[in-house]
Design a protein with these regions (language model features):
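C-terminal-of-GTPase-core extension/linker across diverse P-loop GTPases
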Residues: 1-189, 194-200
Length: 200
């Protein structure tokens, strides 16, 4: 199947293969089996038509499979955003009609292509994002932090990132009964804020 596709000029990323075949192919490191992210650098004047950038660039043929993405950005504007403080950057993006920076879109597309999500832990002295494969359960997510937390896993207190922003603290969420208790088989979602209860 792979040989036929390669001889026909079809990238391996476009093939649908069973997991055991994918494992066998891993050792060969075929470049065409890797996810493809195309970042298009647009002129400022073309930003309002960013949704048509793929068509205008004539790269539709590269974006036929599920493992390909194109993200249009304007590098000049991204440089300006990077040099501003967060409040000014938000106002600047709002003036341009941008909901998020190009860098954020590239990161999101990369995570999506690689099959990763992020969850957050919030503490007194540290807030942190953790990257895990999509479909990871709560106990294995706890193992990303420390193997002792995974072994002693009892429950996970879970809320959405947006809810934490609205209430301000986990204590406020607890007071309003907005923290859910989930077991070890709970599938962690992108943007979950989790406090792991564990035995020491």
């Amino acid at each position: 199947m792979c040989r036929t596709a390669l001889e026909a000029g079809q990238p391996l990323r476009d093939l649908t293969m069973p997991p055991e075949d994918l494992r066998r192919l891993r050792g060969f490191q075929f470049l065409s089996s890797k996810p493809l992210l195309i970042v298009l650098n647009l002129d400022e004047a073309d930003l309002p038509q960013a949704d048509k950038a793929v068509e205008l660039a004539g790269i539709q043929s590269f974006l036929t499979g599920p493992n390909t993405r194109a993200v249009p950005i304007c590098a000049k504007i991204e440089l300006e955003i990077a040099q501003l403080d967060p409040a000014d950057a938000s106002a600047f993006m709002a003036d341009l009609g941008l909901k998020e920076s190009g860098l954020d879109r590239v990161i999101r597309a990369s995570y999506d292509l690689l099959g990763y999500i992020s969850f957050f832990t919030v503490g007194e002295d540290e807030n942190r994002a953790w990257s895990i494969p999509r479909g990871t359960n709560a106990q294995n997510a706890a193992g990303e932090i420390h193997s002792d937390i995974q072994r002693g896993f009892i429950r996970a207190e879970v809320c959405r990132y947006e809810h934490l922003l609205a209430r301000g603290t986990l204590a406020a969420l607890r007071d309003h009964a907005e923290l859910r208790l989930e077991g070890k088989e709970y599938i962690v979602l992108d943007g979950d804020v989790i406090n792991f209860r564990h035995a020491t």
